[in-house]
Structures are given as structure tokens and as C-alpha cells.
């Protein structure tokens, strides 16, 4: 697991995402980022000064906010598991070494995030608001089609490792080590072409405990709660350039997607 720094690695990751981008307009994307809530047993006052920082009110349990960046092939290129469960994605990302690594990406390369992340030329996020003009809505839709790779990567990770289906009960200092090991093993399994055991192949007891994933999308129980209300505004050159490219080729959100998301 290594963050891309060499021209060869950057070009390899960017080519894989561009091939999956409609009209190949998302040139330069080398990853997609998001947060994963991993449940843990409550830490003790001997482990941390503020135990409640590890409690997520939205999840109703203790845990860790794990930040990660995935490539187009469901491999993780970077991860951080040092933030308490109550931490939002913005804070967890900015307090990790990942944010420094992303900030050093060469001009023209970037990762994708959702509205919880800070917009920059190296980290593109959706345009804020509802009822957007077609060109902004198109950008948001096509960004989400690529950003979903990190959610699918999390989904594969969680479905594969049964130890994540219940709160981690290893020692407090051992939890980050265990989580990192699972991420490395995930990449190894992807490289080896190993497929997680299907639900139909499992014993009934195990099948009932396994988190149910559809198209490898992460179940809600593992998602970090997202902020509600107004989103941050602003614009950066890279995002505007892609939005204009989509507009120039007449690429809009597919009608079937609009109809599926229209309230009836």
C-alpha cells in the first residue's frame, strides 16, 4: 500500500480511472477517498483521557473513523486509522498524513471526495446545493460514478473479514495495527484475484451475521455520518475545467437516473 509519487504510478492510476469515466473527461484522477466507521469496544480511562470522543452518537456505539483512498481496481493506496469515532470526515482527513500527501500531488492529478471534504485542485468535491443547473448536476453525477469505487472497496473489505462484523475487542493500542493489517491483506487478496466467500456458501449462522452488501456498496452501519445543511462553496480550476468539458461534449446526467431519483 503506497501513495502514488512516481510519474509511472500516477499515470497508471489515472489511466484506470479515466477509462471508467464517461467520455474520459476525468483525466488525472488517481483515487477516491471516504471514511469508514469501524466499531470497537469502549476504551477505558486508562487508554484515553476523553472516552466519549470515541463514541459516535449517530451510530450509537464506540469506534474509529478510518480514512482511506482507493484506486479504480478496489485497492487501497493510503489509509489512516488514528481518529476517534465521533470525528467527522473533514477533521479526520485533515489531521491525517493523507491530507499532506494529497496536497503534494503534481499539477493535473487529484483525488475525489464527497461534500464532507475540503475542496482543492488536488481534492475535487461535488458542487453544493439542490436543483443545480445541468452542467453542475452533470459534474456531480459523473464524479459520484467514480467516487463510488472507494465505497465498493470498503464493502469488499467489510464483507471479507468477519472480525469487522462486531466491535473489535483487541487491546486499544493494537486496534490500529489490526486494521492496517486487514487493509494490507485486502490488497493482497485483490492482487491474487481472491473472491470473498458468497453468502450461499456459508453456514446459516455466519450468513446471518455477515453485513449485507449490494454491488459491494458499504452498509450504512459502517458509514461515517455526513454533515447536513449548507455545504462549502467556492471553485477551483481543476473542477471547473472538468465541468466545462462535460458541458462541451453535451454529457448530462442520464434520464433514467433522474427518473429513478424523482420523488413519486
Identify the meaning behind each predicted range.
Residues 1-264:
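Short, well-ordered secondary-structure "scaffold" segments embedded in the functional core
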Amino acid at each position: 500500500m503506497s501513495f502514488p509519487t512516481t510519474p509511472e504510478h500516477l499515470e497508471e492510476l489515472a489511466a484506470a480511472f479515466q477509462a471508467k469515466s464517461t467520455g474520459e473527461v476525468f483525466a488525472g484522477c488517481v483515487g477516491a477517498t471516504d471514511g469508514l466507521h469501524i466499531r470497537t469496544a469502549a476504551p477505558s480511562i486508562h487508554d484515553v483521557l476523553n472516552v466519549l470522543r470515541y463514541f459516535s452518537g449517530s451510530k450509537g456505539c464506540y469506534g474509529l473513523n478510518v480514512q482511506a483512498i482507493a484506486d479504480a481496481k478496489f485497492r487501497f493506496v493510503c489509509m489512516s486509522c488514528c481518529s476517534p469515532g465521533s470525528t467527522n470526515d473533514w477533521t479526520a482527513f485533515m489531521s491525517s498524513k493523507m491530507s499532506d500527501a494529497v496536497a503534494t500531488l503534481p499539477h493535473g492529478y487529484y483525488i475525489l471526495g464527497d461534500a464532507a471534504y475540503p475542496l482543492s485542485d488536488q481534492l475535487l468535491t461535488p458542487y453544493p446545493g439542490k436543483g443545480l443547473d445541468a452542467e453542475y448536476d452533470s459534474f456531480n453525477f459523473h464524479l459520484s460514478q467514480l467516487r463510488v469505487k472507494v465505497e465498493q472497496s470498503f464493502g469488499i473489505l467489510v464483507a471479507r473479514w468477519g472480525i469487522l462484523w462486531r466491535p473489535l475487542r483487541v487491546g486499544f493500542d493494537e486496534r490500529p495495527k489490526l486494521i492496517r493489517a486487514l487493509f494490507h491483506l485486502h490488497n493482497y487478496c485483490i492482487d491474487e484475484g481472491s473472491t470473498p466467500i458468497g453468502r450461499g456458501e456459508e453456514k446459516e449462522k455466519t450468513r446471518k451475521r455477515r453485513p449485507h452488501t449490494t454491488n459491494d456498496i458499504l452498509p450504512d452501519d459502517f458509514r461515517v455520518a455526513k454533515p447536513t445543511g449548507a455545504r462549502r462553496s467556492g471553485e477551483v480550476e481543476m473542477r471547473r475545467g472538468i465541468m466545462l468539458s462535460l458541458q462541451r461534449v453535451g454529457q448530462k446526467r442520464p434520464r433514467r437516473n433522474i427518473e429513478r431519483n424523482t420523488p413519486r
